[in-house]
Amino acid sequence: MSDNDQTPVSTATDAGDAGYNKALKNRHIQMIAIGGSIGTGLFLGAGGRLAQGGPVLALSYAVCGVFAFLMVRALGELAVRRPSSGAFVSYAREFLGEKGAFVTGWFFFLDWAVTVMADITAVAVYMHYWNMFQGVPQWVIALIALALVFVLNMLSVKAFGEAEFWFALIKVATILIFMGVAIWAILTQAPVGEYTAGVHNIAESGGWFPASLPVVFALTLGVVFAFGGTEMVGVAAGEAKNAATILPKAINSMVIRIFFFYVGSVTLFAFALPYTAYSGDESPFTTFFSGIGVPHAADIMQVVVLTAALSSLNAGLYATGRTLRSMALVGEGPRFASRLNKNHVPYGGIIITASLGLLGVLLNALVPSSAFEIVMSLAGIGIAGTWAMILITHLAFLRKVKRGETQRPQFRMPGAPYTNYLALLFFAVVVSSNVMTFEGRATLALFGVVVVLMVAGWYFVRRRVGNLTDEAAASLQGDETLVSGD
């Protein structure tokens, strides 16, 4: 394997990049960006949010999409300057120090570890929709799903990229088909179940803002978390060919996808049917296609929703494996997570995440009625913390630029540093609005517990972190020479 196919190692901040293959092409990066920004938040969550808040949901997606885009642009600037599979953890280490890297990494791991728990259980629930699988225990299906995606991740980064490419392609094709059929139904005022499609459904069901302000704020929190995964493109940059060229294209096109797919789809849902016709128990796509009489619509949408869950699971194992390795090499995570297999895959970190995923099956067996609420609240905490740390890291980077210690790449976050502060304020307001509901207050309480555990964890590992940082960089210089000589 040539030197050009491997990630160079020069400093401790680069140590976690040693040994990876740069096998992800432009189409993989583009689809990973799509897979991260379009997922179960649209295919599953949009129905329930529409039923609660009405057409204003489209505006919520638009506003939250802008701030998610700003966060990704901040990450993109850092990634173009120095692509790293450690992504925001590596950048936090460079600009905030080891303490910042520790907090960022464990927030991100918390997010995706509990999301994996939710995803494998979701796959099992979706499979039970069909009669032929109803006799199979839920834990068996969950285990098979986890094993399948685990194997894909262990094979190679190219196998992961190919799987995510096709998962994302199915989601995009489904949305495009829906949008075409929905526009036709609205223009022709075609019957959709007991209703008639058309813009009149907005006025006849209470206008654009039928819900109260507290409800809208509660929905906004859910919408922000629906964009969780957009940061995945930063992790993939470390294993991309020509990252400096293809990463800006992937990130810039993300804002178009957000507005076109999310805002466009939700607006069409509101025109096609009164918002009261939707439900949190059913995908809005299924509601629409069933209403216009498309044969086997529910079966088709069940396959798509299943694909969305597998896509999320696939991305979760990929990202957490690499993040844990970056942390393990400097003493911030378990040593086992630092190991690579012969395919240059961080199998240690992937095994740890997959093992925690099995706890999701146990959780659903013990508290099936509230399991998803528990894990998604924890995931929300991880997303909020990760995004905030990305923006704070970018601010620290800008301070070094101002002092003349480094330079900004051509691909820059627009309006920085003011947009950093604006985005941080927005996320703080949205998270703080949790006090309006009992579930939200419980989430904030969990956030406090996580912060306490992180503080305690840092004091537990900080002595060995400093010693291992320099050792990791030095030892990996030798490893890089061996890998490049394969």
PLM regions and their residue ranges:
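A generic transmembrane alpha-helix motif of multi-pass inner-membrane proteins
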Residues: 374, 378-386, 415-486
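TM-loop-TM module centered on a large, flexible mid-protein loop between adjacent transmembrane helices
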Residues: 90-92, 97, 129-133, 203-206, ...
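Membrane-interface loop-to-helix entry segments
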Residues: 124, 138-197, 251-255, 376-389, ...
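Helix-loop-helix connectors at the membrane interface of multi-pass transporters/channels
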Residues: 2, 6-15, 90-93, 99, ...
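Membrane-interface "cap" regions at the ends of multi-pass membrane proteins
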Residues: 1-47, 51-56, 69-73, 85, ...
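Hydrophobic alpha-helical segments and their helix-loop junctions in multi-pass secondary transporters
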Residues: 170-203, 267-273, 387-404, 461-465
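C-terminal membrane-solvent junction of multi-pass transporters and transport-like membrane proteins
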Residues: 166-167, 336-347, 387-438, 468
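Extracellular loop-to-transmembrane helix junctions
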Residues: 21, 44-141, 254-263, 443-452
